[in-house]
Amino acid sequence: MEGETLSDNLFLISVKLVNKDNQAFSQSYYMTGLEPTALSDVQRTFEAPEYETTVGIDLTKLDAAQIAAQIAQAKTMLPEGHSFKSVGSYQIEEDVPAGNSVFNRNKTFGKQHTSFVVRFTEDGKETESSAGKTSYIYYEAEVTVEPDGTLSIEEN
C-alpha cells in the first residue's frame, strides 16, 4: 500500500498467517522504519484458515520484474486522455474457509488471486479549486491478474 495518495511510494506491507493450531493473525510492516505492528487476531467470521490445507504464498515465486511488467501493461490499459499516477495497493490473496459458511460460497480453497489498484488522473483536470482549497482529482481501477498472466481492468 502506498503511504501518501498518488506518491507511488511503498509504505505498508500487510501479511496474514496461520499457525499449526489454526490460529490466524495479521501483521503490518512499515517501509518508513517504524516498528511492525503487533500480531492481531484475524476476524474468523470471514477468514478461518486451516494450517494443513492452506497453500500459502511461495515467496520464491515473487518476481519484482514480473510485477513491474504487470504495472507497465496496466498503464497501457487506461482510458485515452488519462495519465497513470501510482499503484495504491498490490494484493496476493488465497481463498480460505470462513468461520461463517455463508462466506464460503464460490470459493475454491487454496486458489490464489492477484490484483492491484492503479490510480490515474484525467489530463488537464488533475485538480479542482473551490473556496480557496485545491483538491486532487483522481480515479482508481482494479487490475486483476488472471491465472494465465493476462490482465483485466475495471474502474472503481
Predicted regions and their residues:
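A short, surface-exposed beta-strand/turn
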Residues: Q23-A48, G124-N156
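Serine/threonine-rich low-complexity intrinsically disordered regions
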Residues: D58-D63, P79, P97-N104, T121-E122, ...
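Exposed beta-strand-loop-beta-strand "reactive/processing" segments of non-cytosolic proteins
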Residues: M1-S28, E94-I137
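Glutamate identity and glutamate-enriched acidic tracts
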Residues: E2-E4, D8, E35, E47-E52, ...
